């Protein structure tokens, strides 16, 4: 693996070809769709996120989505922010469910746990506080591993604004060891990740700029990490949401049935519940 980023492959043309779509997913571990979601629904979620940041005192009342900036992601009361963003209206809208069902090829259940992100630019910082290491969502979420993560931007992203990089085909090796790495800290705590030296040269990192309405869907064992927001001239906000989808017939675990705030506000469940919504002793 190198730090050189290649583009995602746009899988939108495969949506009506079941065999080709499944073949691509099985080989690469992700599906990237351009403009598949209703842009008005995505815009509404972005405006709700802006409303929350203003109401909680982190943005000026006159701020718009085009001019928004905040001082710190971690300074915002994330549990309170969830009261403003009605993400389930987007995830479970009939037009969105149609996309999920086309991707999975069967009826789906959308997790009740959603992660929301609003990262300001950290231009000039070598190690922004909100970096995440290479990791697998399946390390934290279960017990079944047939879920897929769905990640969407609420505002346009770029190489400067960042987003999610996936390691092409890395899901095929199954679960990997996650080790505590002091370099990566969230809310003052070191978090676990997969050492870069564990990856082969064939597991190329992929990242593409995305627009509202685009969606990236990937395997529970897809290795992925954040690309930091280091945008400058102009600096921009990175606003995103992610959830998980799974076959409706599959077992529904803690993360599938528990809204993120209910887990995150329970300090006894540990720092990973604050980050992922999943209680775990692996910290």
UniProtKB/Swiss-Prot annotation:
Binding sites annotated in the UniProt record for Fe cation = 135, 137, 224
Q: Which InterPro entries match?
A: DxPntBtaHylase, Phytyl_CoA_dOase-like
Segments spanning the bilayer are none
EC category: oxidoreductase
Q: Spell out the reaction equation it catalyses.
A: 1-deoxypentalenate + 2-oxoglutarate + O2 = 1-deoxy-11beta-hydroxypentalenate + succinate + CO2
Q: Which UniProt keywords apply?
A: Antibiotic biosynthesis, Dioxygenase, Iron, Metal-binding, Oxidoreductase, Vitamin C
| Pathway stated in the Swiss-Prot or TrEMBL entry | Antibiotic biosynthesis; pentalenolactone biosynthesis
Query: Binding of 2-oxoglutarate: at which residues?
Result: 135-137, 151, 226, 238
**Enzyme Commission number, as recorded:** 1.14.11.35
Where is substrate annotated to bind?
117, 186
Please list where the region (Disordered) is annotated.
260-283
SUPFAM superfamilies per UniProt: Clavaminate synthase-like
* Entry-linked Pfam families: PhyH
Q: What GO MF annotations does this protein's record show?
A: 2-oxoglutarate-dependent dioxygenase activity; iron ion binding; L-ascorbic acid binding
Q: Would you say which domain of life the source belongs to? A: Bacteria
GO BP: antibiotic biosynthetic process
User: Which coenzymes or cofactors are required?
Assistant: Fe cation; L-ascorbate
User: What is the role of this chain?
Assistant: Catalyzes the conversion of 1-deoxypentalenic acid to 11-beta-hydroxy-1-deoxypentalenic acid in the biosynthesis of pentalenolactone antibiotic.
Give the family, as the similarity comment puts it.
Answer: Belongs to the PhyH family.
Protein name per Swiss-Prot or TrEMBL: 1-deoxypentalenic acid 11-beta-hydroxylase
Q: Which organism is it from?
A: Streptomyces exfoliatus (Streptomyces hydrogenans)
Q: Which gene encodes it?
A: penH
